[in-house]
């Protein structure tokens, strides 16, 4: 059978369940942070949509097709609060009513099964109280399912909402889970979901293979990759060496024999095209982590997340505008706007906006607007932030770093050459030279991944 899953798109009734996904998970509290972090934003549940979204998610298609991919199987589910159908019903609930299917365990990615654990914090196994099912942590002492956890399973179902940026760890936890399942003869079933940035933007530095880590598992993948998790899964299993095989030192370096033997099924969406951004889907955004609470923060993560690496740049305006606001110590909003406007970065504008400070009082900061989506290159701002940080700092902030700081920068940004040039040139670095090189390599990556794309372009000309 082709690695593209073929799904008969027959219509079925989509029922909403009553079982809450997050409540009832019991565990020890996460370890305290070494550095103070802003308070977690309050997440207000969105209402059930008045109009049925046009896009059917993988879980919707699975149910519409009569659950045939899981029928007669003992399964586990890797998911989080954003793993819901198009009505907002948790995938957990949907699978619990699947006929002739036995759901026996749950797995949780970074941020936990309830999505409230801060970035980077480890957590242990717990129990989902409403069902009594075990929840195995994949962001603690184990980063992939163990043989004991997989014992007796026929399939692991994965339903995770990604945000389209390479360092967001859900594509990594998926790959690690796939590796474990392939090694121990367990099928992987990926329920596909939209890339909220769409499937056209491919941008930023590719991941140098030696920079593999928990925030980067796919060699030569640009920071904004333009793929869905289902497409990434197909690439990880069936791709050739340049884009799928990691160095032997990696804990995700499977042999070709094991990868070929592994069984992967991707249940694709219906109605999604590559030119669709999240608002075009008609789906409501459910937070994927404590600070990615809106579609606006998804955009910001791609835009400024790398710019804060090993610099004094900060994101947010007080408690508000996660990843959309930017600040720099001892620089006023006007000074920041003037400095960044001088670079004439296409597709964005810097404006003053009011947020809420830590003391609850109003605070003014700089907000980054996307003014022209077609001209906007998602990651470009981050590299001018690096350049400006070196200009504003008394000493080059990219020299004199510890080995851990160097490693952190490289695994997030991906490019050894960019870091080396930052160390050498500091504020004199030639950003456009690197942007041009990365654009050329992004075009190559588009061609290398073309055969794994499951969805048409939409009304945008092919090849873009």
Regions found by a protein language model. Name each.
Residues 271-349, 358:
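Glycine-rich, aromatic-lined ligand/substrate-binding cores of catalytic
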Residues 162-174:
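Glycine/threonine-rich flexible loop motifs
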């Amino acid at each position: 059978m082709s690695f593209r899953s073929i799904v008969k798109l027959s219509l079925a009734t989509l029922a909403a369940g009553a079982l809450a996904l997050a409540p009832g998970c019991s565990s020890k509290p996460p370890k305290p942070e070494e550095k103070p972090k802003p308070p977690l934003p309050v997440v207000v549940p969105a209402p059930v949509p008045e109009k049925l979204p046009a896009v059917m998610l993988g879980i919707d298609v699975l149910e519409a097709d009569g659950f045939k991919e899981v029928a007669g199987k003992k399964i586990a589910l890797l998911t989080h609060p954003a793993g819901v159908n198009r009505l907002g019903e948790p995938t957990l609930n949907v699978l619990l009513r699947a006929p002739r299917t036995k759901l026996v365990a749950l797995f949780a990615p970074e941020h936990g099964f309830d999505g409230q654990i801060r970035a980077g914090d480890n957590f242990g196994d717990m129990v989902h109280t409403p069902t009594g099912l075990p929840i195995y942590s994949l962001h603690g002492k184990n980063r992939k399912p163990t043989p004991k956890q997989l014992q007796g399973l026929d399939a692991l179902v994965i339903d995770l909402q990604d945000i389209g940026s390479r360092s967001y760890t859900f594509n990594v936890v998926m790959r690690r889970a796939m590796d474990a399942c392939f090694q121990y003869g367990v099928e992987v079933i990926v329920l596909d979901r939209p890339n909220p940035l769409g499937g056209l933007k491919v941008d930023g530095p590719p991941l140098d293979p030696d920079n593999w880590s928990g925030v980067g598992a796919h060699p030569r993948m640009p920071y904004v990759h333009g793929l869905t998790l289902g497409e990434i899964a197909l690439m990880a299993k069936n791709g050739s060496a340049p884009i799928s095989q990691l160095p032997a030192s990696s804990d995700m370096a499977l042999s070709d024999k094991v990868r070929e033997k592994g069984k992967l099924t991707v249940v694709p969406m219906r109605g999604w095209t590559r030119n669709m951004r999240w608002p075009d889907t008609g789906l409501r955004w459910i937070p994927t982590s404590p600070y990615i609470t809106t579609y606006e923060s998804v955009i910001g993560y791609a835009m400024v997340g790398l710019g804060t690496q090993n610099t004094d740049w900060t994101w947010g305006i007080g408690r508000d505008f996660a990843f959309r606001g930017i600040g720099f110590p001892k620089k006023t909003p006007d000074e920041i706007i003037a400095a960044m406007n001088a670079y004439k970065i296409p597709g964005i504008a810097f404006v003053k906006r009011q947020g809420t400070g830590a003391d609850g009082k109003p605070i003014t900061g700089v907000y980054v607007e996307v003014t022209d989506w077609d001209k906007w290159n998602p990651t470009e701002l981050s590299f001018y932030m690096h350049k400006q940080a070196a200009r504003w700092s008394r000493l080059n902030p990219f020299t004199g770093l510890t080995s851990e700081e160097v490693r952190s920068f490289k695994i997030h940004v991906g490019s050894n050459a960019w870091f080396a040039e930052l160390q050498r040139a500091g504020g004199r670095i030639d950003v456009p030279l690197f942007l041009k090189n990365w654009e050329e390599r992004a075009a190559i990556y588009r061609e290398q991944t073309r055969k794994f794309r499951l969805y048409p372009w939409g009304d945008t000309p092919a090849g873009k």
